[in-house]
UniProtKB/Swiss-Prot annotation:
Keywords: ATP-binding, Nucleotide-binding, Transferase. The keyword Nucleotide-binding applies. Coiled coil: none annotated. Involved in the formation of 2-(5''-phosphoribosyl)-3'-dephosphocoenzyme-A, the prosthetic group of the acyl-carrier protein of the malonate decarboxylase. Its EC number is 2.4.2.52. GO terms for biological process: prosthetic group biosynthetic process. GO terms for molecular function: ATP binding; triphosphoribosyl-dephospho-CoA synthase activity. The keyword Transport does not apply. InterPro entries: CitG (IPR002736). It catalyses: 3'-dephospho-CoA + ATP = 2'-(5''-triphospho-alpha-D-ribosyl)-3'-dephospho-CoA + adenine. Belongs to the CitG/MdcB family. This is Probable 2-(5''-triphosphoribosyl)-3'-dephosphocoenzyme-A synthase.
């Protein structure tokens, strides 16, 4: 890997089997890509997440651990840098940037599965982060400093019409194989991450980012801030991972329990913590893993860092 301050050819960091690319990476792209990877790493490093992989537990997962996530996060980092650079170089309409970043991300999805020996740790996170990287890169053409609302507006513009194009039943019925998200859309009409992105990530914009800012203003630690933000997301997100594992009734119950935790003061007082333990045990006992909310937590942390640039508490 080259020093961050250098301008390098994409060919130096692209997977061997990827197509030849003709642009170079500048220092701003390294910086933004690093912040996106940091969001992924901080999400998985957060302890006591219900049903999710974290430092002291594999949650409801038997095929992955913290180590698996460390491997996949490092493997996909170059894609985040290159997607940022693609945004910085983009001159056309914003919807035309989407196939560019997806084309960059596709070979890294294969690299991810190769590195984890077939375990899907961050396929969805890569999809979201690649789009966020392209959006951040596009905004950084004018200035490295931009408002978080601008970031979500560009994401919405990039992904306009993605649900109609990719989740239309007439389109899905012609495909030989469907992803879990596509199957759930046919069954329950839940648009998943595509719906979130097309609407400018409303769960992140309207709930998670304010929750993270609130926790930081309160003086909470990083872990407490991230856990509070995750609970906030779980109270709002139609998490396809939960639906896939437990159906719509489980999703409804998880959202209700998460709202009760927040109502009692979240994890910032005894009543809220007691309610949180109940939520955590509910997820563990039923094998529920809110992976969609976890991916959005990573996006929230990255978006916060891209706009606020630093946390108010100690990094520990």
């Amino acid at each position: 890997m080259v020093a961050r301050g250098n301008v390098v050819s994409i060919g130096q960091i692209a997977p061997k089997h990827s197509s030849e690319v003709s642009f170079s990476v500048d220092p701003v792209s390294w910086e933004i890509g690093s912040l996106l990877q940091r969001g992924m790493l901080l999400e998985v490093a957060t302890s006591n997440k219900p049903g999710l992989v974290c430092p002291q537990s594999n949650g409801c997962h038997e095929d992955m651990s913290l180590m698996t996530f460390m491997v996949s996060s490092s493997v996909i980092f170059p894609a985040l840098v290159m997607c940022t650079q693609a945004g910085r170089d983009h001159e056309g309409d914003l919807p035309l940037l989407l196939p560019v970043v997806r084309g960059i991300g596709a070979p890294y999805e294969k690299e991810l599965f190769a590195a984890t020996k077939g375990v899907n740790t961050q396929k969805g996170a890569l999809f979201s982060a690649a789009i966020l990287a392209g959006a951040a890169g596009y905004l950084s053409q004018k200035s490295r400093h931009f408002q978080i609302g601008e970031l979500f507006e560009v994401v919405a513009a990039m992904t306009k019409g993605i649900v109609r194009r990719e989740l239309n039943p007439s389109v899905l019925e012609k495909k030989e194989s469907l992803s879990n998200g596509e199957k759930l859309y046919l069954r329950h009409q839940v648009p998943g991450i595509r719906g979130e992105l097309e609407r400018g990530l409303p769960s992140v914009r309207d709930y998670a980012v304010p929750a993270l800012k609130y926790a930081q203003d309160l003086g909470a630690s990083l872990e407490a801030s991230f856990l509070h933000t995750l609970i906030t997301l779980m109270s709002q997100v139609d998490d396809t991972n939960i639906i896939s594992r437990g159906g719509l009734e489980s999703l409804k119950k998880v959202k209700t329990l998460s709202k009760e935790v927040l109502k009692e003061g979240s994890i910032f007082n005894k009543e809220g913590i007691d309610n949180y333990f109940y939520l955590e045990n509910f997820c563990i006992d039923r094998g529920l893993s809110p992976g969609g909310s976890a991916d959005l937590l990573a996006i929230t942390i990255s978006a916060y860092l891209l706009s606020e640039e630093k946390f108010k508490c100690k990094i520990m």
